[in-house]
UniProtKB/Swiss-Prot annotation:
Main location: cytoplasm
Top-level taxon of origin: Eukaryota
Name the UniProt record assigns to this protein: Transcription activator MSS11
Organism: Vanderwaltozyma polyspora (strain ATCC 22028 / DSM 70294 / BCRC 21397 / CBS 2163 / NBRC 10782 / NRRL Y-8283 / UCD 57-17) (Kluyveromyces polysporus)
Biased composition (Polar residues): 173-218, 564-581, 599-640, 666-677, 704-720
Record family assignment: Belongs to the MSS11 family.
GO CC annotations, alphabetized: cytoplasm; nucleus
Composition bias type Basic and acidic residues, residue spans: 1-13, 584-598
Length: 810
């Protein structure tokens, strides 16, 4: 023991015995030999598993990986083996290609059975440096923890840089924070007691301690744990802080009082004392109690005071300090609180308050300016408001219009155009409808005779009354107007609708548009209604007696009826053309016709419908009149040598004076006034009567005729003054008859012109040009005869003036 003490003493003194030196040298040699063996030894690695810091999930595993790597690099193999057994090292499945192992890492687990006692695991480190990550790790943590361990608690507490802004809610176990917290509470109580009674001053903001509050910390000893030696200093500092706070309060109050003296008046409190309030409420008081001009003046004064605020407030504060020192000599002003110029420095808290007041005053000025601008701005009228609203609505309306136009364009583009097959089908439908109309008109014409026979007397009486009323200048009644028109058996409304739909279908077909199915269905329904009405009319007429001879003779725009050989009555249609001479001639002609007529089969002339204009006047011309069917089935057949001779036979017949055939049908006409010498034949333009059976016609000396033989054996007589056109056959085409009709139409034009020239008192509607008549003739030529469009049923296509009459619902 004594030797050991000696060696220790020698070690402290730096001196060692010879034995000790020899023993130490022997130990070093043995350790060097071990190190050489370890350095020369080559460990065996198991490359199936590797240690990698990339697979570390915690900081502890990361540290273990670098410790193991450090042991391998320094050849501490035995320590590394033991470390693998005890530490949780992050492992990675090994691979021959190290890059692949790093890119696609997979975690692995190590068991003691898998690892040979003489084997080690290789390392694959991502964070590897010359000094190794382990050294940097320990240097970082040592620098952190050494600072904490070496420094005292008081020094750490003094480094609280935010101590003036952060206040603890509950006192801590340390004595220093509790003293500071209690002192701050006492300061707040004193500030509340020294206030002038305004509760709003307590909400000006949290109290900020002066820099002098930190004196007790700097005066304390950093080596001592408790500040016992600074009790007296703290009391002195508290007194100084209280005096400073009082001075700052008085300074703020004086600055506000100076503003009150410059003209700003605030309302008083309950005790009658005036007190200062926050400038935010000043704006409301000023705006409520003063006019705009007074407010502007007050704001100008405030602006001047604020521009001189720094120097003015410093001077006022210095004066306040002097007054306090004179009033209370026991509390002199120390030199530390006054700068070299003799002015008291403004605290940061008061300066912030002053700046906030300035900002509020500027906001108040801006509000006043905005109010003045609004008052000076002229208010818009109602018209201007409406115009602005309309302008605002214009873009919306334009957008809606554009949307509608776009929709229409899209719908037009998407609308399917009719194909050629559809157009062909439409044309076939039109042809079928025309054929059905022709067949219906023929069937109705064959059965219309008995009905016209019964209605003849009543119609003739009504027409006579209407014509008498027109001649006397009296207005016609609605019943008389209806009697003048030939209503027929078919409803005119259905015909009008049918024809209007036909026109629409034709326009659609011309424009290559598709015909809707609804229109086609309506057409078929109207066709069925027409057929039903015609069948009902036929059923009503069956069983009634039918006469063998039915004549309709329109003589110079007059209707003559001779039922059973009785006396005839002639009534004129127009005032200008009805003269006494014409009446006398008509009576003589009618008497001669009655004498020459067949006794066994008396002729009955059925009245025709007289076209009237929209104002109720009767149209004088015979254009557009509708003739009923003339039935001459029982008349004897004519015998003539000129049958089939054509034009040559016609010329020869004109030279003959007396016909050899007996007279079965007599028709006569009287020439118009002023044209008795050279009279021209008059025909109904565009209207021909269909003949059933055969007929013979003959004329007296005053009415020379031209008899023409038809292909079917019937005869046609062309009268110079009047051409009834009985030779038209509805079942077959006849070229000769067509030529004769064209010639008669030309003659009719001339006759109408002569009538217009000879009758100066005629109406303007009676004056018709040749072009208009030719146009009407062209429009009336449908099929073989006028009956193909149902003209015999009271269905007029065109009126005198060339415009549609009954089609469009005149």
């Amino acid at each position: 023991m004594k030797r050991n003490r000696d060696t220790k003493m020698d070690h402290k003194s730096g001196k060692m015995n010879a034995n000790d030196r020899n023993q130490q040298n022997n130990i070093k040699q043995e350790f060097k030999s071990d190190l050489n063996e370890a350095a020369n030894a080559q460990p065996k690695y198991n490359f199936n598993i590797m240690v990698s810091d990339a697979m570390a999930k915690t900081s502890k595993q990361l540290l273990y990986a670098h410790i193991y790597n450090y042991l391998l690099h320094n050849k501490h193999l035995e320590t590394a083996k033991q470390f693998l057994k005890e530490a949780d090292v992050p492992l990675l499945t090994g691979n021959n290609n190290d890059d692949v192992a790093v890119k696609n890492p997979t975690a692995a687990t190590l068991s003691q059975n898998d690892l040979n006692p003489r084997e080690l695991l290789p390392t694959k480190m991502l964070m590897n440096a010359n000094d190794t990550f382990l050294l940097e790790w320990w240097e970082y943590f040592s620098s952190v923890y050494d600072f904490v361990d070496t420094s005292d608690l008081s020094a750490l507490q003094n480094n609280d840089f935010l101590q003036d802004r952060i206040f603890p809610i509950l006192p801590t176990s340390n004595k220093v924070p509790t003293q500071r917290y209690s002192r701050q509470q006492s300061d707040q109580v004193q500030m509340n007691q020294n206030s002038t009674g305004n509760s709003s001053r307590s909400g000006m903001g949290t109290p900020i301690a002066n820099p002098s509050n930190q004196n007790y910390q700097h005066s304390s000893n950093p080596n001592s744990g408790t500040p016992t030696s600074t009790a007296n200093n703290n009391t002195n500092n508290n007194n100084n802080n209280n005096s400073n706070n009082n001075n700052s309060k008085q300074f703020a109050q004086q600055t506000l009082n100076s503003q009150l003296q410059n003209g700003v008046v605030y309302p008083s409190n309950q005790n009658g004392q005036q007190h200062a309030r926050r400038p935010q409420s000043v704006s409301s008081d000023i705006s409520n109690t003063m006019s705009m001009d007074e407010q502007q003046q007050q704001m100008n004064l405030l602006k001047q005071v604020n521009s001189q605020n720094p120097q003015l407030m410093n001077n006022m504060l210095f004066q306040n300090v002097q007054q306090q020192s004179s009033s209370s000599p026991n509390t002199p002003v120390s030199a530390n609180n006054v700068d070299g110029n003799g002015q008291f420095p403004i605290s940061k808290m008061n300066w912030n308050r002053i700046q906030r007041e300035r900002m509020r005053i500027m906001r108040q000025q801006q509000q006043i300016r905005q109010q003045q601008m609004q008052q000076q701005r002229p208010q818009p009228n109602q018209q201007q408001i409406q115009q602005q609203q309309q302008r605002s609505q214009l873009p919306q309306q334009q957008a809606q219009q554009r949307i509608q136009q776009a929709k229409q364009q899209v719908s037009q583009q998407q609308r399917p155009h009719p194909t050629q097959q559809q157009v062909h089908q439409m044309q076939q439908m039109q042809k079928q409808l025309q054929q059905q109309l022709q067949q219906q008109s023929v069937m109705q014409g064959q059965q219309q005779g008995p009905m016209q026979l019964q209605q003849g007397q009543t119609q003739s009486q009504g027409q006579g009354q209407a014509q008498d009323a027109q001649q006397q200048g009296q207005p016609l009644s609605q019943q008389q107007m209806k009697q003048l028109r030939n209503g027929g058996n078919v409803d005119s409304n259905i015909q009008q609708q049918y024809m209007s739909m036909m026109m629409q279908m034709m326009m659609l077909s011309k424009n290559n548009q598709q015909i809707p199915q609804q229109m086609q269905q309506q057409m078929m329904q109207q066709m069925q209604q027409l057929q039903q009405q015609q069948q009902q009319a036929l059923q009503q007429n069956t069983g009634k007696p039918q006469l063998s001879h039915q004549f309709v003779v329109p003589v110079n725009n007059q209707v003559v009826t001779t039922p059973g050989g009785s006396s005839t009555s002639a009534r004129t249609k127009s005032n200008a053309r009805s003269t006494n001479t014409n009446k006398k001639k008509m009576e003589t002609v009618s008497k001669k016709n009655n004498k020459r007529s067949d006794i066994n089969s008396p002729a009955t002339i059925v009245p025709i419908s007289t076209p009237t204009s929209s104002d109720g006047n009767i149209i004088s011309s015979t254009q557009g009149t509708n003739f009923p069917i003339v039935n001459l089935s029982q008349a004897p057949t004519p015998t003539s040598k000129a049958e089939g001779d054509g034009e040559a036979g016609q010329n020869k017949k004109r030279r003959r004076k007396k016909p050899k055939t007996p007279n079965t049908n007599v028709s006569a006409s009287t020439p118009t006034a002023g044209n008795t010498a050279n009279s021209t034949p008059v025909t109904t333009s565009g209207v021909n009567s269909s003949v059933v059976g055969s007929a013979t016609t003959s004329n007296d000396k005053r009415t020379p005729s031209n008899t023409v033989a038809n292909n079917d054996g019937s005869m046609q007589t062309n009268v110079n003054e009047l051409d009834i056109g009985l030779g038209m056959n509805t079942n077959s085409n006849n070229n000769n008859n067509n030529n004769n009709n064209n010639n008669n139409n030309n003659n009719n034009n001339n006759n109408n012109n002569n009538n217009n020239n000879n009758n100066p008192n005629s109406n303007s509607r009676d004056k018709i040009n040749n072009n208009d008549l030719n146009m009407n003739l062209d429009m009336m030529s449908f099929g073989n005869s006028a009956s193909s469009m149902g003209l015999n049923d009271g269905f007029q296509l065109f009126d005198m003036d060339g415009f549609p009459n009954d089609i469009m619902g005149s």
